[in-house]
Amino acid sequence: ILGTILGLLKGL
């Protein structure tokens, strides 16, 4: 889901 992608970006 989009939430997962956003989570990865925040992890960077």
Swiss-Prot record:
UniProt record similarity statement: Belongs to the MCD family. Protonectin subfamily.
GO BP term, example: chemotaxis
Protein name in the entry: Protonectin
Gene source species: Agelaia pallipes pallipes
Miscellaneous field: Two derivatives of protonectin with substitutions of all the amino acid residues (D-prt) or the Lys residue (D-Lys-prt) with the corresponding D-amino acids have been synthesized. Both derivatives D-prt and D-Lys-prt exhibit strong antimicrobial activity against bacteria and fungi, and both of them could disrupt the integrity of membrane and lead the cell death. D-prt has similar hemolytic activity than protonectin, while D-Lys-prt has significantly lower activity.
One cellular component term from this protein's GO annotations in UniProt: other organism cell membrane
Domain of life: Eukaryota
Motif (Dimerization motif 1): 3-7
Intervals of motif Dimerization motif 2: 7-11
Tissues expressing this chain: Expressed by the venom gland.
UniProt keyword annotations, A-Z: Amidation, Antibiotic, Antimicrobial, Chemotaxis, Fungicide, G-protein coupled receptor impairing toxin, Immunity, Innate immunity, Mast cell degranulation, Membrane, Repeat, Secreted, Target cell membrane, Target membrane, Toxin
Recorded consequence of changing residue 6 to P: Loss of antibacterial activity, and loss of alpha-helix structure
Residue positions, PTM Leucine amide: 6, 12
Molecular function GO terms recorded: toxin activity
Localization in the cell: Secreted; Target cell membrane
